[in-house]
Amino acid sequence: MKTFYVASYGKGNDKGIYIVSFNEETLELKKIQQILTQDFPSYLIAKNKELYVSYKNAKSNNEGGGLGSFSIHKNELILNNNYSSSGRSYTHLCISDDNKYIFAANYHVGATAAYKLENYRIDHKIGAVRHTGMGPDLLKRQTAPHVHNVGFTPDRRFLYAVDLGADKIVMYNYKDG
């Protein structure tokens, strides 16, 4: 039996985060738990018995979007906290190896954000860097920055942000803090 997590943009009571089990012998899927969310969960990371989620703003104002942190207890998710990004919608996340920081890619405004984690909770926003530039396809998707992925280089010396809109990879020196 394997357990995994699903983020859903569903409508009404279908929206949220699901815990699903998969029986490899019978090929049966079973919904274990659903957590209804106000915003659209768009990306999930499970690490160290914690689940981190990025939310796409589902509201027409700047109150939604952001990050969430859940503790994983057997087959149940328990909310640690949510942290609003004031309408910003993150599309990808990564966590530092020491579990002190979470980094977020914001496709819609073309920015990379950093948050401090404290006891696996999202404590506060450290800052954000807005990207600049355009890519070669000025008639469609590359008229402005669109950061869609963040991660660490294999040697962990740099945080990178892949920017589809600006058609570049931005490298940030990474040091603890």
Regions from the language model: what does each represent?
Residues 7, 54-56, 105, 162:
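Residue-level marker for isolated small/hydroxyl-bearing positions within beta-strands
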Residues 46-49, 95-99, 154-155:
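Residue-level detector of Asp-centered blade-edge/turn motifs that repeat once per structural unit
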Residues 16-18, 65-68, 111-113, 168-170:
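A short loop-to-beta-strand structural motif that recurs across blades of beta-propeller domains
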Residues 21-27, 70-76, 115-124, 173-177:
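Short loop/turn segments immediately following beta-strands, especially the blade-tip
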Residues 13, 39-42, 89-91, 146:
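Beta-rich catalytic cores
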Residues 77-148:
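Asp-box/WD-like beta-propeller blade repeats and closely related beta-sheet repeat scaffolds
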Residues 10-13, 57-61, 108-111, 166-168:
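Short glycine/acidic-enriched loop and turn motifs that connect beta-strands
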